[in-house]
């Protein structure tokens, strides 16, 4: 009961490095594995999200659905196939400011809630230098490029609002304790599975234990009637790729290229679950409580890209590229908090005694792309790409202690699958200087048939451009549609919430040739 003395709740915080590592490893296990099977673990972050990429960058690349493996000739296309640098004929500098807005429509226990988030960013910026080699046999030119492409946006917010939810998050905590035969002595921050959630609920009297009855089990303070729940997630950050690329043009038939890429991840994820107790429930003095979780992940990675474009005829182009896995060194920091409000008492507030801090290595999957393009003289072109991504190749390893993450990697093998992404694009030249563009892309579902979730999405895009010998201006609009299914906690206790996401991205590229 809330009126009993608080002294028996005060658990000594042990702040040693071994405790910190154990807590963090267990946390990453939950995050990177259990979230894959759509159960709500500590948060939404998982290795899959950090490894995926989208069609972003320059306005021309976005407008044509990213179908540039066989085309080249655009700055952001270098990130798709580095051989595309060999197609460029002159030096150029370009920058792409962009506006991104995402709207979510979430349904939970029959109630729909709309949420949104937006931001301005730089989709790409870089410079290309081309050297004429007409005097060196059939090698026409060599090229070098340096710049940045934004390859993934983590910006997103969504809200679940549930009325008359039959179970509580605290019920999930209670079941965990009972099923594992645990007592109050186990609710210590040093006990890895519970230090950032159940421990806080215990400190705030949301879980209790009759200390004078040794045959009793844990009970919770949420009462017996259905409750109202609100769950809000706010994510932000991006994945940016800085690269140095080299390429060449052989006899205007064969274009080759390679690049060294350095990827930077900055990701934040904040969520809060709030539960309001039914005022008619006379079995408890609890009015409401909330559980909040905050985390950041940041770090750097590196990899190599190789590519080739072959032009068997003046109209037909074939392309292929290969991307090695990106090896990231990442740091994760996180903390949690719990607030409980009982009738007649000041609010109880408990913050996680430790701030999670752990360094680990993440290896993203390899990628291979194949493209086909047909150029209709000066009238326009059509292009298509097929991209293979092996998500079962995701690997993890602890940096500070060498922890292998083998159980988590086994789960990745069990729940993820390789995917094929399809991209299509077209360009029609209205006049000598003006072009209209359109694109469509299908990104496959990385979850296999054993997982009740859909991780694929579709992209639709339009654009136009003006180009002359000195400068160019391109604009694009991209629409992305996706969906998600998520359990806030134990799927045996609660229904899944579903979200439909609509992303709107507007990009403008300004370029100067010299």
Residue ranges of model-derived segments:
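Outer-membrane beta-barrel translocator/receptor signature
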Residues: 59, 71-80, 86-165, 240
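Outer-membrane beta-barrel porins/channels
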Residues: 42-56, 61-62, 130-514
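Bacterial Sec-dependent N-terminal signal peptides
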Residues: 1-47, 514
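Short amphipathic alpha-helices and their capping/turn segments at secondary-structure boundaries
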Residues: 83-84, 250
